[in-house]
Design a protein with these regions (language model features):
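NAD(P)H-binding glycine-rich loop region in Rossmannoid oxidoreductase-like domains
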Residues: 1, 9-16
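A short helix->loop->beta-strand "cap" motif at the edges of active sites that frequently abuts
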Residues: 1-3, 35-36
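SDR active-site strand-loop-helix element
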Residues: 4-9, 41-43
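Conserved beta-strand edge residues that scaffold enzyme active sites
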Residues: 10-11, 45, 135
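Oxidoreductase cofactor-interface core, primarily capturing Rossmann-like NAD(P)-dependent enzymes
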Residues: 15-124, 148-151
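Short, Φ-rich (hydrophobic/aromatic) sequence segments
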Residues: 59, 160-161
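Mid/C-terminal beta-alpha module of Rossmann-like enzyme folds, strongest
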Residues: 91-159, 170-237
Length: 237
């Protein structure tokens, strides 16, 4: 094996990490300390159908016009389109084979989690969502609530919500020296959402892998996605 490429999670260098983020960071460190040169890409929320973090945004925004939420909805995150993540992963083979390090990767937008939900609402043709931050809503309670109002399994919701207690933004842009961004730039958040939804001009609102508007697009749902990925939109709210 000549090179390991691992996709980890963005996380602050100092402070307490959730078990989920700490585990991903530990896996990256194991690879970096191995005898095989390793590139560890650290990304925040990946925007594309099937991404658990994106699917949680999708389901909560579609179902709830009014939403009690933990204080982490005010935290800053730097989402990245799945096609940009795949581009980095594929072009990692062009990086000096002796290089052994982490790289932060993220899209051009730094948003609060609540802003991401309302950005999704705009692209989905839904009214703006009203989000109330409640300091007493713990991550555990929030995950129970998410699993009740959405098809996201509790065992998926718990680590995602716990990891959102930290700001997840890019702290360095060294990757640009090795893999320059595309000429048109990395995809903005709302553009990435639009691609993930694959909405048709005629008003088709439900996306399936059989009827995706761009065949083979990385933002499209896949047959291997879990049952809760890529559900249609709720227009009643």
């Amino acid at each position: 094996m000549g090179r390991i490429v691992y996709l980890g999670g963005l996380h602050p260098e100092e402070g307490h990490l959730s078990k989920h983020l700490a585990s991903r960071a530990a896996v990256g460190e194991l690879f970096l300390y191995s005898p095989v040169p390793t590139i560890v890409f650290q990304a925040g929320i990946v925007i594309g159908s099937g991404s658990a973090s994106f699917e949680m945004i999708r389901h909560l925004t579609e179902v709830l016009p009014y939403m009690p939420a933990p204080h982490w909805v005010r935290n800053h995150v730097q989402p990245i389109a799945i096609r940009d993540v795949l581009r980095y992963l594929l072009l990692a083979v062009s990086i000096d084979e002796e290089l052994n390090r982490t790289f932060d990767i993220g899209g051009p937008d730094i948003l609060r989690y609540g802003q991401m939900m309302n950005g999704y609402a705009v692209e989905a043709g839904l009214p703006q969502r009203h989000i109330a931050s409640l300091p007493v809503l713990t991550p555990w309670l929030a995950s129970q609530w998410v699993s009740l109002v959405s098809p996201i399994p509790r065992q998926i919701a718990v680590p995602i919500i716990a990891s959102l207690q930290n700001d997840c933004v890019v702290s360095e842009h060294d990757i640009d020296r090795y893999i320059p961004p595309p000429v048109e730039g990395l995809l903005p958040y709302r553009t990435a959402v639009r691609l993930a939804l694959s909405r048709e001009a005629g008003g088709e609102v439900e996306t399936s892998w059989q009827s995706a508007t761009v065949p083979g697009a990385p933002s499209d749902p896949l047959p291997s996605d879990p049952d809760w990925a890529g559900h249609g939109l709720h227009r009643s709210a």
